[in-house]
């Protein structure tokens, strides 16, 4: 405990990152007020049915920077972020179909450790991303990666383990993820992703193997281009504690 009160300003932003509400004061009293508006913006009670297939695109530059949508460790984090945001409206056999150039550019100036992490995941009995955990301290203390973090504007090497920790959720909570249009499809398959040349091919394969012939399909064309919302069922009673992981969640579950 610091023993002092801190004066803070807290702005609530909309989907276009514009300020829609500003509060000032002691953080302990002021921030819960700001969270009420932020929750109304973020948790959108919209869906009247669960979706079997979700379709969206993955730009090259978003979230953590340029290259986010071209190397598969960062891509897995982004895919898992979609699970976190929308799991309340996903069916239990949901499939993602995602466009990405996935060309193997790791942007090593920004993430100098990612290629080594990816290559290590392909060997040494690494079956799922959590198996990589035992190498966390090794990467986090590797001198050259630390030097690039300190002096060359790179991310800290342990950041890659944060990405993989989140990235495992995509495998856990979807039946399959298809990457469409990959220029280096092998690196996508190396992370457990399926690859197809077109959306039509991916959709037909998903219907045949996972969803049946008449899936509920949700297209999200603005994914990763605006500030995300968390889609919820229109009826708050359908947003379960199990899906939210919190008993008093603003989505109503």
Name each model feature, range by range.
Residues 3-6, 49-52, 91-95, 123, ...:
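Short coil/turn connectors at secondary-structure junctions
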Residues 14, 59-62, 102-105, 184-185, ...:
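Short, glycine-/Ser/Thr-/acidic-enriched flexible segments
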Residues 52-57, 97, 218-219:
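Structural motif
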Residues 1-52, 57-60, 77-90:
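Conserved, well-structured core segments that form the ligand-binding/active-site neighborhood
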Residues 73-178:
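C-terminal catalytic subdomain
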Residues 165-245, 250-251:
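Extended hydrophobic packing segments that form well-structured cores
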């Amino acid at each position: 405990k610091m023993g002092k009160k801190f004066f803070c300003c807290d702005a609530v932003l909309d989907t276009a990152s514009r300020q829609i509400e500003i509060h000032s004061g002691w953080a302990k009293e002021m921030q819960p007020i700001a969270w009420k508006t932020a929750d109304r913006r973020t948790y959108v009670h919209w869906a009247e049915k669960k979706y079997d297939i979700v379709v969206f695109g993955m730009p090259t530059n978003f979230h953590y920077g340029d290259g986010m949508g071209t190397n598969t460790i960062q891509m897995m984090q982004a895919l898992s972020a979609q699970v976190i945001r929308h799991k309340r409206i996903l069916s239990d056999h949901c499939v993602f179909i995602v466009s990405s150039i996935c060309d193997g550019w790791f942007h090593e100036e920004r993430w100098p450790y990612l290629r080594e992490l990816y290559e290590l995941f392909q060997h040494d009995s690494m079956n799922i991303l959590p198996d990589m955990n035992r190498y966390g301290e090794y990467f986090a203390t590797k001198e050259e990666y630390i030097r690039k973090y300190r002096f060359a504007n790179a991310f800290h090497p342990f950041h890659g383990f944060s990405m993989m920790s989140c990235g495992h959720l995509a495998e856990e909570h979807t039946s399959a993820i298809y990457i469409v249009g990959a220029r280096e499809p092998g690196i996508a398959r190396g992370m457990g992703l399926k690859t197809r040349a077109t959306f039509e091919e991916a959709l037909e394969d998903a219907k045949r193997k996972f969803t049946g012939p008449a899936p509920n399909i949700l297209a999200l064309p603005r994914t990763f281009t605006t500030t995300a919302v968390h889609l919820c069922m229109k009826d708050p009673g359908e947003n379960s504690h199990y899906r939210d992981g919190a008993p008093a969640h603003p989505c109503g579950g």
